[in-house]
Amino acid sequence: EKIGSGTTVAKEGPFYGKFTRFLVRLDGKLNDPRYAFMFRPKMYAQTAKLKDLLSKILVADGSAQVTILDLSGVPFDIVNTIVSLLARLIFDFNFWNPSRRDFPILLVFEEAHNYLPSSGIGTSAARRTVERIAKEGRKYGVSIMVVSQRPVEVSETILSQCNNYVIMRLTNPLDQNYIKRLVPDSFAGLVDVLPSLRQGEALIVGEAISMPLRVQVDFPKPEPDSSDIKFYEKWK
């Protein structure tokens, strides 16, 4: 736009330029291959019926006992929504399933601090859904397992509903104090050993055992790709 003596200045678009910036961001999402599953979906099941898709996810035909949903390639900003949607669908499936007692489901949430944050960190659709499952799921045959390296960042409502804890090495005082609040008072002193646990060692506390145990987990052979990189051996 030209004003006065011919000086040219940029003119903001509608809504003070916010709409233009929104269109640019939207175009970026549409062309991002990581979002292709949402904007250019493929037919993953033989039909578009929800019950058929759920049957495939839950392997209702009994051909397998474990289903792994790998969300590592999903953009971080929508992982929360996807986890919430999947957890709610599975919970509702067993909620209305008349044979729920013959079809118990365990949902395992890896790296839970990324999408099941404590209430002080922010809102989370996934957290609200999983909190409901933690409180009501047992009646409908749906239980949860929460895995996290930072328990202090995970919803206390969810962790407090857990009956058993497998606690590995923790050196952060905030995490240690958080665990002390979760375990029974008579076992709180055991948390003091957490910083001294070696790799593969864990402290098990809960209703599944008559008394707390300090155990050594056998190392897998061959080691998975997720094992720690031995920096010192590679650099020396």
Regions found by a protein language model. Give the residues of each.
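P-loop NTPase motor domains
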Residues: 1-132, 206
